[in-house]
Regions:
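A short alpha-helical cap/connector motif
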Residues: 1-131, 138-159, 163-213
Length: 213
C-alpha cells in the first residue's frame, strides 16, 4: 500500500497513538499483520475508530469484514461493558484467532462473531446500529453502503476504510474493478442527503458519515 502521508508524518502519528495506549496483545496482532502481510487498519486509524465511537456514545457496532479482530479491538474498548460489537468474516480461522486475542485483552465478552458472508450476517441481525463499519473486499463496498445506510440510527456513524485506495481513486486511467467500486461507493455516500460525510486522509483514507436525517 502506498502511503498517502509522508513517512515521517505516518511515524509521528503512530508514535502518538502508541504513547496513548499500550497492550502486548495489540503488539502481537500488529506483528502478525506485518509478518504475513495481513491488512489491518493500524494503530492510528484504530485510535480514530475508538474516538469516533466514543464521541457518539456508541453501544452497538456492526463490522462488515473483521479479519482476526483488530478493528473490533478498538470498537470493543469504546462500547464499554454491556456494549456489543458484531463481527463478520468468511474464515473460521480468523474467528478463532479473534476470540483468542480479544479474550486475552479482556474484550471478548463485548464481541459476537458471525462466520460467513458479511451482508448475510448483517441481514440476520435485528434493529439499527450506532455504527456500521465497512472493510470487506473492495468490490463489495457499494452494496455494503446501500445496506448500512438504512440501518444506522439518527446521530450514528458509517465508517469505511481504504476509501482512497493508495490514491488510485484519483487516477482517471485506473479502471480496476476494485478502484471503480470504491469510487462508486464514495460518490454514493457523498450524494446521500441523510448523511454529512468526509474522508479523513489517514493511512489509506477513512470515510466518516454522520446520519443527520
Amino acid at each position: 500500500m502506498e502511503q498517502l502521508l509522508a513517512p515521517a508524518l505516518e511515524e509521528y502519528l503512530l508514535d502518538l497513538a502508541r504513547s496513548q495506549h499500550g497492550d502486548p496483545v495489540l503488539d502481537e496482532m500488529e506483528a502478525r499483520a506485518a509478518a504475513h502481510n495481513f491488512p489491518i487498519v493500524g494503530r492510528a486509524v484504530g485510535r480514530l475508530l475508538e474516538v469516533q465511537a466514543r464521541s457518539i456514545g456508541a453501544r452497538r457496532v456492526m463490522e462488515l469484514g473483521s479479519g482476526y479482530g483488530y478493528s473490533a479491538y478498538w470498537f470493543a474498548r469504546a462500547v464499554g461493558d454491556g456494549g456489543s460489537v458484531v463481527c463478520t468474516d468468511a474464515a473460521e480461522d480468523n474467528a478463532r484467532d479473534a476470540q483468542r486475542y480479544l479474550q486475552r485483552a479482556g474484550l471478548w465478552e463485548r464481541v459476537r462473531y458471525r462466520v460467513g458472508d458479511a451482508l448475510q450476517g448483517f441481514a440476520a441481525e435485528e434493529g439499527d446500529f450506532d455504527i456500521v463499519y465497512c472493510d470487506v473486499d473492495k468490490t463489495g463496498y457499494p452494496d455494503c453502503w446501500r445496506a448500512a445506510s438504512e440501518r444506522i440510527r439518527l446521530g450514528g456513524l458509517y465508517l469505511c476504510d481504504n476509501v482512497l485506495w493508495s490514491g488510485r481513486v484519483a487516477q482517471p486511467e485506473n479502471s480496476e474493478a476494485s478502484t471503480e467500486a470504491i469510487r462508486v461507493h464514495n460518490r454514493l455516500v457523498a450524494a446521500d442527503s441523510r448523511y454529512v460525510s468526509t474522508i479523513a486522509p489517514l493511512r489509506d483514507g477513512v470515510m466518516i458519515a454522520l446520519r443527520v436525517a
